[in-house]
Amino acid sequence: GWTQKAGWTWRAPFGKLAQDNEPAVHLTFDEAQQMCRFQGKRLPKDHEWVKAAYLEQRDQPPTGFQKGQRYTYPNGQSAQKSHCLNGCGNYQGTAPQGALWRGVGHVRVMTTPPGVNGLFDMGGNVWEWVDTGQGSEKMTRGGSWWYDADRQIESDVATKPRDTRVGYIGFRCVQDQ
C-alpha cells in the first residue's frame, strides 16, 4: 500500500523544495478548493474541464486545431508530446531533456506544447481535481506522468477519496465571468 513520506508536501514534492513554475501536488480536494477560493476562483466542474480540454473553441486556432472539433486527447488527436509514463510519442516515459530536475515525477508547467484551446498540461503531467463527485469521492481528470497515454482520453474518469494527497494529483482554478 501507500505510505506517507516525511517531508513530502505541496511545498516539497518528492521531498525537494518546489519551484514557482511547478504544478501544486500533494493537496487534498478540499485544500485545492481552498487555494482556488483564496484567489477568488474555484475548481472547475467536470463538464467545464472536459469542454476546455477536448472541444476547440478558439475562433482562429493555430495549425493542427479546428474550431468546433472535439479531440481525442487534450493535445489533439494523439498524446504526442504530453508527459506520461508510456504512449506519449517522443517522450517515451521521460520528459524533454533537462525537464525532470528531480529525476522523477511531473515537469514544470508549460514544458510541453499547448493543446486544445491553447491550454497547457491538460493531458498528462498531473491529474487535476474537478468539483464533481458524491460524498467522499471526487473526480480527477487528464491523466498524469504516472499513467499511460490512454488515461488522457475524455471517457477516462478517475475518482479518489477527497482526502487523497499524492504526488501525481494537482489542480487548476477557474474564474467565473
Language model: regions and residue ranges:
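Short, structured beta-strand segments at or near domain termini in extracellular proteins/domains
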Residues: 167-177
